[in-house]
Amino acid sequence: MGTIKSGEIEKGSFLLFKGMPHIVLEREFSKMGRGGAIVRLKLKNLKNKSVVKETLKGADTVEEIEVLEVSSQYLYRDSENLIFMDLETYDQFNVNLREVPNIEDKVLFFQEAEVYSLVKWDNEVIDLKLPPKVAFEVVAAEAAVKGDTVTNAMKNVTLHTGLVVKAPLFINVGDKILVNSETKEYAERVKE
């Protein structure tokens, strides 16, 4: 997109920093008496998800980049790839599990025929976004012990994608539950 001065950087901007795409998480502008202005940034690398803090002088320039979010339908998974379909062109494409960082944490949340947001930079998928909560069907649940409710009793339940989470004792096989996609914890039962 072009270069911008450090004073023009906003929270949420996408920058090419040290050859890697980053998003600005925090920005703090300071004007030092005769020393000039400085900008403190907290940046998240979009490829490896590391977070770094950087300080730039007011006259420094950085390259702003364009990152696209594309809605695509998840079709299926083979041994090394997730297969998606572009909703505009109906073309199918692969996302290699080894090429997208931290994707293994998200794979068990993907459900066939659901639409997900893929983050692309330089025509390459660098992230897959999940909704905050995802609905699953319970396919296996440990038996609840009657009277075991002195504390907030939880049991392991297995969901139809293979994900195992802790859920309250009243959750049974066949129930649908919402799971927080960030914490991988039970959120609530889906009301039908």
Swiss-Prot record:
It holds the Pfam family EFP. It comes from the Bacteria. The keyword Membrane does not apply. GO terms for cellular component: cytoplasm. One of its GO terms (biological process) is peptide biosynthetic process. This is Elongation factor P. Involved in peptide bond synthesis. Stimulates efficient translation and peptide-bond synthesis on native or reconstituted 70S ribosomes in vitro. Probably functions indirectly by altering the affinity of the ribosome for aminoacyl-tRNA, thus increasing their reactivity as acceptors for peptidyl transferase. The keyword Protein biosynthesis applies. InterPro entries: Elong-fact-P_C, NA-bd_OB-fold, Rib_uL2_dom2, Transl_elong_fac_P/YeiP, Transl_elong_KOW-like, Transl_elong_P/YeiP_cen, Transl_elongation_fac_P, Translation_prot_SH3-like_sf. Pathway: Protein biosynthesis; polypeptide chain elongation. GO terms for molecular function: translation elongation factor activity. Belongs to the elongation factor P family. Keywords: Cytoplasm, Elongation factor, Protein biosynthesis. PANTHER family: ELONGATION FACTOR P (PTHR30053), ELONGATION FACTOR P (EF-P) FAMILY PROTEIN (PTHR30053:SF12). HAMAP family: EF_P (MF_00141). It is found in: Cytoplasm.
